Structures are given as C-alpha cells and as structure tokens.
A protein has these predicted regions:
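Intrinsically disordered, low-complexity and often Lys/Arg-enriched segments
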Residues: 2-3, 29
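N-terminal secretory-pathway/extracellular module detecting exported/lumenal segments
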Residues: 26-137
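Bacterial N-terminal signal peptides that target proteins for export
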Residues: 3-15
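Hydrophobic helical h-region of N-terminal Sec-dependent signal peptides
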Residues: 13-21, 25
Length: 137
C-alpha cells in the first residue's frame, strides 16, 4: 500500500466515523422522508435533510419500513468518484418506534462495496449524487 493510499484510507475512515457520530443522533429528528420505492414488502425512504457532502463523499440516511410496522435505518457514506459505499451504522426499530438494536461499523468491518445495478444502494445513489446537499460533513 502506497503512502497516498494509506492517507486516503485514513481520511475515508475518519469521514465514516464523523458520519456515524453526527447522523446517528440526528436521524431520529428527520422530518423529510422521501419515498424511493419497494423492496419486496418493504417500503424504502431516504431523509433529504440528512444528505451531506464533502468533496466526493456523500452521507445519507435510508430507512426500510417493513409491512409489520418495524423499520431499519441505515447511515451510508458514498464515494461518488469510485461509485462505492460503506455502511456507518444500522438501527432497528420495533413497530412502536422503540430502538431494538444499534450497530456501528468501521470501514475495516464493512469495507467499501461497489454500487450494484438494480440495488437499494443504486436507487439511493441516483437520488443523492446529483442533488444539492443540505449540510456538509
């Protein structure tokens, strides 16, 4: 690994950690959920107020609402130059909105994955990549 790659990895890891710390607490106050589509019985939304951008990195919160009323919320970090993403955190809610489980991830845990065609991540990526951010990281 070159020095440049090591520095980039450290910067991306720091950005992912900053995303986790700043958006995990904010998402419970989100009021701008926009419908993205269906995944089986789940309805997918993203929070327009959570979109933040720093250079080629875009942070966003997505939520999957299940038919039984439970929900899962994901905090993503997208690298728009490489068309890749990593997951910073996942929060599971019961049908009453109570938190069941919180997971946070480091880049080394989840890694950077390519945005695949026809995936939830691609749907989200297409929505945020060309839209102005409401905040910066």
């Amino acid at each position: 690994m070159t020095v440049k790659e090591t520095i980039m990895k450290k910067l991306l890891t720091s950005a992912a950690l900053a995303l986790t710390l700043t958006t995990a607490g904010m998402t419970s106050y989100a009021v701008n959920w926009v419908y993205l589509g269906q995944d089986g019985n789940d309805r997918i939304y993203y929070d327009t107020s959570s979109v933040s951008r720093q250079g080629n990195l875009v942070a966003v919160t997505m939520q999957e609402r299940e038919a039984d009323g439970e929900a899962e919320e994901y905090n993503y970090l997208f690298d728009t130059h490489r068309k890749k993403y990593t997951l910073a955190s996942k929060i599971e809610y019961d049908r009453n909105g109570n938190v069941k489980k919180i997971e946070t991830f480091h880049e080394s845990d989840f890694g950077w994955k390519k945005v695949k065609e026809n995936s939830e991540e691609e749907l989200l990526y297409k929505q945020i990549v060309n839209k102005p951010a409401t905040a910066s990281l």
